Amino acid sequence: MAAGMYLEHYLDSIENLPFELQRNFQLMRDLDQRTEDLKAEIDKLASEYMSSARSRSSEEKLALLRQIQEAYGKCKEFGDDKVQLAMQTYEMVDKHIRRLDTDLARFEADLKEKQIESSDYDSSSSKGKKSRTQKEKKAARARSKGKNSDEEAPKAAQKKLKLVRTSPEYGMPSVTFGSVHPSDVLDMPVDPNEPTYCLCHQVSYGEMIGCDNPDCSIERFHFACVGLTTKPRGKWFCPRCSQERKKK
């Protein structure tokens, strides 16, 4: 594939990337603003509770505490949604980077293959010209000697035959391109510095959920690895932390 085709295909693949990034960043800004609004509401409710705690009934104080708790719950949901958006944005960009690395590797492999073909053709062409020149000189000498002696003709013929048999035109080795197949470079290495998560000890990708146990050693899990298809409502604990909680 020509270099222009590689570039054209890659540019087509990233055509919508700026709009997708802009959308995700705008959603994250909206989540930040909603979180700040809720934090202001929590401060207001907390001040109201502290200033009038003695004069309020138990039911009124409990209602205020529930409002504060619900506001904190929504803040946590907004935070989780923002983390999911950030991970989705990272995966989106990383996918295009891997695509670019793969196309570059294929392009370099194509260049190597063409260089080998060109070198092989130039070598065969120069050696072929040299062989033809030698045969022409031998034939000329044979013709000049043939006028004076009939015995020179068979020798000249033998020399010409020998030249044809040993000519590089008929003895060039075949070139194998197996070492530069583009398919050998499709699997790109994973960044060794990228952190791993989940029970599978893999890098972050797709939809993930965080364990609500602050002491969880793993912290985040892939939906598929913990049997989830949608984000559960309320608190969620990973399988390990759930077992520990049951023991207590």
UniProtKB/Swiss-Prot annotation:
Site feature: Histone H3K4me3 binding: Y197, M208, D212
Binding site for Zn(2+) 1: C198, C200, H222, C225
Citrulline PTM positions: R132, R165
Main location: nucleus
Keyword Zinc-finger in annotation: yes
Molecular-function annotations in GO: methylated histone binding; transcription coactivator activity; zinc ion binding
ZnF locations on chain (PHD-type): 195-244
Entry keyword Zinc: yes
Motif Bipartite nuclear localization signal positions after renumbering to this chain: 127-147
Stretches for region Disordered: 115-160
UniProt record, GO biological process: apoptotic process; chromatin remodeling; positive regulation of apoptotic process; regulation of DNA-templated transcription
Sites of N6-acetyllysine modification: K112, K127, K129, K145, K147, K155
CDD domains cross-referenced by the UniProt entry: ING_ING4, PHD_ING4
Coiled-coil stretches noted in the UniProt entry, renumbered to this chain: 25-118
Keywords: Acetylation, Apoptosis, Cell cycle, Chromatin regulator, Citrullination, Coiled coil, Metal-binding, Nucleus, Tumor suppressor, Zinc, Zinc-finger
Post-translational modification as stated in the protein's UniProt record: Citrullination by PADI4 within the nuclear localization signal disrupts the interaction with p53 and increases susceptibility to degradation.
Entry-linked InterPro entries: ING_fam, ING_N_histone-binding, Zinc_finger_PHD-type_CS, Znf_FYVE_PHD, Znf_PHD, Znf_PHD-finger, Znf_RING/FYVE/PHD
GO CC annotation: histone acetyltransferase complex; nucleus
Family matches, as SMART domains: ING, PHD
Record's subcellular location: Nucleus
Subunit details: Homodimer. Component of the HBO1 complex composed of KAT7/HBO1, MEAF6, ING4 or ING5, and one scaffold subunit: complexes containing BRPF scaffold (BRPF1, BRD1/BRPF2 or BRPF3) direct KAT7/HBO1 specificity towards H3K14ac, while complexes containing JADE scaffold (JADE1, JADE2 and JADE3) mediate acetylation of histone H4. Interacts with H3K4me3 and to a lesser extent with H3K4me2, the interaction augments KAT7/HBO1 acetylation activity on H3 tails. Interacts with EP300, RELA and TP53; these interactions may be indirect. Interacts with EGLN1. Interacts with BCL2A1.
UniProt record similarity statement: Belongs to the ING family.
Function: Component of HBO1 complexes, which specifically mediate acetylation of histone H3 at 'Lys-14' (H3K14ac), and have reduced activity toward histone H4. Through chromatin acetylation it may function in DNA replication. May inhibit tumor progression by modulating the transcriptional output of signaling pathways which regulate cell proliferation. Can suppress brain tumor angiogenesis through transcriptional repression of RELA/NFKB3 target genes when complexed with RELA. May also specifically suppress loss of contact inhibition elicited by activated oncogenes such as MYC.
Record PANTHER family: INHIBITOR OF GROWTH PROTEIN (PTHR10333), INHIBITOR OF GROWTH PROTEIN 4 (PTHR10333:SF106)
Comment field on protein domains: The PHD-type zinc finger mediates the binding to H3K4me3.
Protein name per its UniProtKB record: Inhibitor of growth protein 4
Source organism of the structure: Bos taurus (Bovine)
Gene name of the encoded protein: ING4
